[in-house]
């Protein structure tokens, strides 16, 4: 179990990065496999434990930085959820957790997954849309690990992974973009057509197709035959076009001044102000509409605080359990979390000033 003060310090990093305009958020993942072991789907329990022990030992030996090895079978569910939420980790964790682990550094900048789809996934989250800086951190850690670990590598196919399309650099780059105006105008699907061979669009949550909070998640489909720089450059290009289209869509909404948009925004404020239970879909969708209203200067915060960050994370159940429950009695039961979520959003909604 991760010490509570360490987890709190990691989770609150986002609170110091408040900006009036939400920026795209980026996550990067490098996949690696040990050259001496079979891929994860072919490993026995004993083999998975051996892989975990081998990799964890090397993290512990890294000088100048402290890492915490967290076997999933021993990690409380709420704490596991909180870590996955903070890092926007893209992998769904099943019920069979033997030989699987998460590893975090004390600075809260990096997360590693052991024996998930591959033996090792080195993962990081970038809150300020500087993916090149994050990539260098991942590469630096990868180089340090390669001093003592031999990763499966082919001169023809690069780093070998369980998914053939993920070989090569084995880099997955994801961008999370807030696009409420494009979603409202049903313009997003057409906008993404030219890029659908390069990038996949998905939901905020793994294994879910539902759109939450008007958030678009884009990730590269293939890393084979592409350099890290090419992947990031392509991602930046697509995101810039999406942001430009979103700005145009918002300007159009302001010009048209539609009653329906204002009505949705005001209803969202009312929902967050007066609800006694809120599920994640309701809360994120309402927050998205309010953030749209703030960008149009129809709503402002009396304390001049932006709403979207950190609420983008803080409405999720792991964070709600961390911030709003006693240490000895944390629960992520649906009914309990729905009540806590409504209680947590109420004071933030009450200090909003309506300019419509």
From Swiss-Prot:
It catalyses: L-arginyl-[protein] + ATP = N(omega)-phospho-L-arginyl-[protein] + ADP + H(+). InterPro entries: Arg_Kinase, ATP-guanido_PTrfase_cat, Gln_synth/guanido_kin_cat_dom. Keywords: ATP-binding, Kinase, Nucleotide-binding, Transferase. Residues 22-249 form the Phosphagen kinase C-terminal domain. ATP binds at residues 25-29, 172-176, 202-207. Its EC number is 2.7.14.1. Pfam families: ATP-gua_Ptrans. It comes from the Bacteria. Signal peptide: none annotated. One of its GO terms (molecular function) is ATP binding. HAMAP family: Prot_Arg_kinase. Catalyzes the specific phosphorylation of arginine residues in proteins. Belongs to the ATP:guanido phosphotransferase family. This is Protein-arginine kinase. The lineage of its organism: Bacteria, Pseudomonadati, Chlamydiota, Chlamydiia, Chlamydiales. The gene is mcsB.
